[in-house]
């Protein structure tokens, strides 16, 4: 958790909340030590200057590093749904469970943000959040319908 706090220091989410709240929530949803650790760290490589090698040098276990390698989305190289398909195809249960937890939490907070945007008549935010929520709902269905060791 200390690594995640360091990596996300000063970052804000779309609603202006501390960005660390999301990885903390995802980590707390984990059912194993690896899922908890990977949940806490799942956005570190995407959203900070830390690399997988940095995390390994800080003592993060190989099982967690393997999950994080799958969970770190290189948006310039791989489309979102291909990224989700790659997580599923890997069969890495830790990565799959963390992605499920990530999606559940993103949808939960996305719906709250959407309702706030509707209440304030923020048309641009309504449109953007609608797009993001639809993407997350589709990804969630992809994983729920996938055949993997649960």
Question: What kind of feature is each model-predicted range?
Answer:
Residues 1-150:
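Active-site helical microenvironments for divalent-metal-assisted chemistry
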């Amino acid at each position: 958790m200390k690594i995640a706090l360091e990596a996300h220091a000063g970052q804000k989410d779309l609603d202006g909340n501390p960005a660390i709240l999301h990885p903390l929530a995802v980590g707390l949803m984990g059912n194993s030590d690896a899922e908890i650790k990977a949940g806490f760290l799942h956005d570190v490589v995407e959203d900070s200057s830390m690399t997988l090698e940095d995390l390994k040098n800080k003592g993060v276990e190989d099982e967690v590093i393997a999950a994080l390698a799958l969970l770190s989305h290189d948006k310039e190289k791989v489309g979102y749904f291909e990224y989700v398909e790659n997580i599923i195809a890997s069969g890495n249960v830790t990565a799959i469970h963390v992605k499920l937890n990530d999606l559940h939490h993103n949808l939960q907070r996305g719906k709250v943000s959407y309702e706030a945007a509707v209440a304030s008549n923020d048309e641009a935010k309504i449109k953007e959040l609608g797009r993001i929520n639809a993407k997350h709902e589709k990804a969630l269905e992809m994983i729920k319908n996938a055949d993997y060791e649960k």
